[in-house]
């Protein structure tokens, strides 16, 4: 297996992922690849000799090669087996820290060194430029695959949450600095730089976390709008990912519907304004995380806090809510 070193006999297993991708292809669904590098969800043994829990940590050079080969193998597997099915890969997920003390003081990118008290192993064993390197590796594989098959058309994205946050450490602006760094990392040989990152994925959990207070706040729409426009100024696309308009009170459905309508209209207006200026609308994809209500969730459940039990456009019985009707009318008018 190409991504392992001489002491590493590990083999990739795509069985579960293949079953999901095959189902999507059979049903005419496009796929977002998520995610190639994420510090929160990569096993410690990935960084050790022989991929063994008790192995010594490998050198930075070995880890760079390991990450490169891992990214290449994953992307190549799915593109060769399901040509054209994947429209985008989230190359790196949630690498920007939320708070001071979680990143180096002199790092304008705010690349996280710790998460919840645990160190970022990519940062520790590859280096502070692991994000840029991951994008370079993904770009090289993408170019190889596109040269081999005209069906391949993959965009490379950086994905994160709280992307519209300007409080505290100002995550929005740090994300911009990170993407700037990625897109000025590799020379194109002609005095410019290769555009390694095509866009920013905006995880969009909007509203109070785990509580009704803070939900359906129009100021959040303003922050979202400002963030999208800032990202577009830096010549990248925007994908709205994991959209969930939080709502913890079923009786607040009228307010939820009105807020969803304003949000949908804001997305439309942003693209229309760009088009009126002779540009392409920056929002090129939208994925809804909270599509259906889930009133059965316990208040202690992570999904209860993250999404809200009444965040859906549909009820738990798959019936369209007023929120769906309002969003549909906004989109149908375009």
Residue ranges and their predicted role:
Residues 43-45, 100-103, 169-170, 212, ...:
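Short, solvent-exposed loop/turn and secondary-structure capping segments
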Residues 4-8, 15, 77-80, 84, ...:
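Aromatic-rich peripheral "rim/lid" segments of glycoside hydrolase catalytic domains that contact
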Residues 107-253:
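Noncatalytic carbohydrate-binding groove/subsite architecture in carbohydrate-active enzymes
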Residues 62-66, 215, 254:
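Short linear motifs at secondary-structure transitions and domain/linker junctions
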Residues 31, 199, 288:
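Short glycine/serine/threonine-biased micro-segments
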Residues 17, 67-77, 169-188, 224-227, ...:
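Short, acidic/polar
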Residues 14-18, 22, 26, 198-199, ...:
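Solvent-exposed, well-ordered amphipathic alpha-helical segments
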Residues 1-163, 236, 245-247:
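Substrate-binding cleft and catalytic face of glycoside hydrolase catalytic domains
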């Amino acid at each position: 297996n190409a991504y392992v070193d001489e002491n590493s006999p590990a083999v990739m297993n795509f069985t579960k992922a293949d079953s999901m991708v095959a189902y999507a292809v059979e049903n005419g669904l496009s796929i977002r690849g998520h995610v190639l590098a994420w510090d929160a969800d990569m096993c410690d043994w990935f960084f050790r000799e022989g991929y063994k829990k008790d192995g010594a940590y490998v050198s930075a050079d070995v880890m760079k090669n390991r990450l490169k080969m891992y990214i290449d193998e994953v992307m190549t597997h799915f593109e060769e087996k399901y040509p054209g099915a994947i429209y985008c890969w989230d190359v790196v997920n949630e690498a920007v820290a939320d708070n001071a003390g979680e990143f180096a003081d002199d790092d304008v990118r705010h690349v996280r060194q710790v998460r919840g008290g645990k160190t970022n192993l990519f940062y520790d064993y590859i280096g502070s430029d692991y994000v840029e390197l991951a994008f370079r590796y993904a770009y090289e594989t993408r170019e190889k695959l596109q040269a081999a098959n005209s069906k391949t058309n993959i965009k490379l994205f950086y994905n994160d949450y709280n992307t519209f946050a300007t409080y505290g450490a100002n995550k929005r602006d740090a994300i911009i600095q990170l993407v700037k760094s990625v897109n000025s990392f590799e020379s194109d040989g002609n005095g410019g730089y290769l555009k390694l990152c095509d866009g920013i994925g905006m995880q969009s959990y909007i509203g109070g976390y785990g509580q009704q207070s803070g939900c359906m706040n129009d100021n959040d729409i303003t922050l979202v709008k400002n963030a999208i426009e800032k990202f577009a100024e830096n010549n990248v696309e925007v994908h709205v990912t994991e959209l969930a308009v939080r709502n913890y009170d079923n009786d607040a459905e009228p307010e939820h519907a009105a807020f969803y309508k304003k949000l949908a209209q804001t997305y439309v207006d942003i693209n229309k304004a760009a088009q009126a200026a002779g540009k392409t609308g920056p929002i090129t994809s939208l994925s809804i995380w909270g599509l259906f209500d889930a009133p059965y969730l316990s208040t202690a459940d992570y999904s209860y806090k993250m999404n809200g039990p009444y965040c859906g456009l549909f009820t738990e019985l798959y019936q369209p809510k007023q929120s769906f009707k309002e969003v549909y009318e906004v989109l149908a008018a375009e």
